């Protein structure tokens, strides 16, 4: 269903905490490493961190090339929350995002927000390797590294982090300008910041590998993935960009391997969802270049049952992307017959149906899906099928419930706006579009749309009161965000 909702936005958010920062030689034993703790209270409270996180997430949605794919969003959040459930010192909710970027990277910022680059799927051979990157970033959050870095910098140069945060925002709109501003801001205190981030990386590695192991993943995946990064730097004509600016020393790899070797060996099979997510990411994203190669699909076809299914799904996906709908349907059919409730297969079947103007077939299949009431992906698929099939009222009925339960999902608001427009409900269309603008940090535009919606309904009506109350909420949000807009 997501084929109709793809967005190709511009700019990239600078990594506040990256997986490839410089790290010093580590001690031989985990027991000798100091625990730096999680205190950062004198600079930022948890509430302030969450507020800043809310602000930056909205900027991210509005300017970065987010992959707003319901299936992939569901997968990385499910995987991320599995890891979070085995982490200590969790003080904020966690949210995981995927950016369409061919460079290997991941970063964490205020309020439990973790961003992954799509290239991680290309370079992760198995789910444990992907999870190792996420566990590392989760540890940056639980240890409050960014807040503690701000606190440390406030002691030596109080204005430095104000400029740095402003530069991060500039980078969202203009990466080169943002990086230049950030470099200039930190020039006078670079050595102190490097030392601090070295400690952060050391702690995130140590805690991350523990989270990885407790979550049931292979702890050897962390040193294995780090070794892949080093191999690229050694042998590739174009090593990962992250290693050009943040070299990864042998000592970090040696320490990660030493820690993994101290843990109980584990044989961990990647989930089927991992292979399906990898096929989908490589086949539909990565800056428009299809990286779902025949070699990879042939390799999977010779692998275990999960890989074989992913290979067949990948071939169906390739055919659908090439508008070869009959071939896609024929390839997908055995998978769907074996697992009629599988959301990955149902989503692709819906795209095939809609591509052939067979919305009614998609509707009938989705209405009978076992997990329809509990799976947001299937709900969005059905709403979209109703919309494409000329039944906007049915779509609106689903989407009003969906947006009530999933207020931060712009897909729901976008589809609801389309449904209300088709029903000629102008005020409700404007209100839905306003929510999409608000999620993207465009609060002025959101307020303007809600004001227009309010003017179109009966004076003094309950609906007008609702619109006006929402306007007041957004104005209060603007006031809370003012300190960050002035950076």
UniProtKB/Swiss-Prot annotation:
It is found in: Periplasm. InterPro entries: Mito/Outer_Membr_Metalloprot (IPR051156), Peptidase_M48 (IPR001915), Protease_BepA (IPR030873), TPR-like_helical_dom_sf (IPR011990). Residues 1-27 form the signal peptide. Disruption phenotype: Disruption sensitizes cells to multiple drugs. Keywords: Hydrolase, Metal-binding, Metalloprotease, Periplasm, Protease, Repeat, Signal, TPR repeat, Zinc. Binds 1 zinc ion per subunit. SUPFAM superfamilies: TPR-like. It is an enzyme of class 3 (hydrolase). GO terms for cellular component: membrane; outer membrane-bounded periplasmic space. The active site is at 137, 205 (proton donor). TPR repeats lie at residues 309-342, 344-376, 377-409, 427-460. Zn(2+) binds at residues 136, 140, 201. Interacts with BamA and LoiP. This is Beta-barrel assembly-enhancing protease. The lineage of its organism: Bacteria, Pseudomonadati, Pseudomonadota, Gammaproteobacteria, Enterobacterales.
